[in-house]
Regions:
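Alpha-helical promoter-recognition and RNA polymerase-docking modules of transcription initiation factors
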Residues: 1-98
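Charged, low-cysteine interdomain linkers and short loop/connector segments
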Residues: 92-115
Length: 115
């Protein structure tokens, strides 16, 4: 797999961001690059769906970026990879809901119950 974001550079930018209280422009660029690459692991019916999932991922990054604790770990890449995957998957689940049965029948009854 190609290296598209340096873990060391990402860590340094996140530390700078935490000191400032907001994400630096460079950290936003690096995180957007990660989102673009990670979004490729999902399959989408339309390009707009991919863009929506990427937006969900960015929303999660903006919501949770300050939860990264550099005192506990220097691996910001792993933290943000998981955050991005979770956000992308939230969007994907919303767009492509799993089809499930909405009826229950029991072997004792001949009835079918609607949920």
């Amino acid at each position: 797999m190609a290296v598209y974001v340096s873990g060391k550079e990402l860590f340094e930018e996140i530390v700078k961001s935490k000191e400032r209280g907001e994400l630096t422009p460079r950290s936003i660029f690096l995180l957007q690059k990660m989102i673009k690459e990670i979004s490729k692991i999902f399959t989408y019916s339309r390009e707009e769906d991919k863009e929506d999932c990427m937006a969900f991922a960015m929303f999660d990054v903006l919501l949770y970026w300050n939860r990264f604790n550099p005192e506990k770990s220097t691996n910001a890449f792993a933290f943000f990879t998981q955050t991005i995957k979770n956000g992308t998957y939230k969007g994907w689940r919303r767009l492509y809901k799993e089809k499930s049965s909405k009826f229950i029948s029991t072997s004792q009854d001949s009835g079918v119950y609607n949920i």
